[in-house]
């Protein structure tokens, strides 16, 4: 299991998240097209539902549960017209420490990742995904809008997230994909997955050349090294 470490940069108007109640709700990046819950991941059929645009979303409950949803496009420097698409989903429990840091521990068997490389294969790669995360957290109430600003361990900023739902929009917080003693899923699902047909249309020329659009490339490159393949 890998761990990612992030810190938060506070703007002049930012305030620390002093309690869990400050985090409760569903947060999403500017597009607001990626939101946790049943519109992103279908646990019954064990499949992702592709949003119209890329983005990130986190949800937190008062009793210490969280859920996260990522849909990112990764630039291809060799062939800019063939970006990769990555969808990730996790949920589990979180702890807000006295120093303001936030520790997120996922349910190991439930996390999912889908990687689509449309120029290399007509099928996407579907795997289990399990990665513990640690953040320092505060909220920026700029102009009265509740906003969550995160920075990575190297002080590079992540995309800000805005409060979109309160109470949060989430799937059940219990284990959704239990495994047997052999480590195999108790639920039989198809392993051939649909590719992400819209990924080429999600990135404009400006986005491909703007480095601020690709803050997560290094994070995903690191995360891919810690993934366990999802066997039937």
UniProtKB/Swiss-Prot annotation:
Keyword Cell membrane found: no
GO BP: 'de novo' protein folding
Keywords attached to this entry: Endoplasmic reticulum, Glycoprotein, Membrane, Signal, Transmembrane, Transmembrane helix
Cellular component terms (Gene Ontology): endoplasmic reticulum membrane
Stretches in topological domain Lumenal: 18-213
Localization: Endoplasmic reticulum membrane
Signal peptide: 1-17
Pfam families in UniProt: Rot1
Predominant cellular place of this UniProt entry's protein: endoplasmic reticulum
GO function term, MF aspect, one: unfolded protein binding
Keyword Electron transport: no
Residue stretches spanning the membrane: 214-231
Domain of life (superkingdom): Eukaryota
Topology Cytoplasmic: residue spans: 232
Cited InterPro entries: Rot1
Membrane topology qualifier: Single-pass type I membrane protein
Glycosylation sites: 52, 130, 136
PANTHER family reported in the protein's UniProt record: PROTEIN ROT1 (PTHR28090:SF1)
Function according to Swiss-Prot or TrEMBL: Required for normal levels of the cell wall 1,6-beta-glucan. Involved in a protein folding machinery chaperoning proteins acting in various physiological processes including cell wall synthesis and lysis of autophagic bodies.
Family that this chain belongs to: Belongs to the ROT1 family.
Protein name in UniProt: Protein rot1
Source species: Aspergillus oryzae (strain ATCC 42149 / RIB 40)
Gene from which the chain derives: rot1
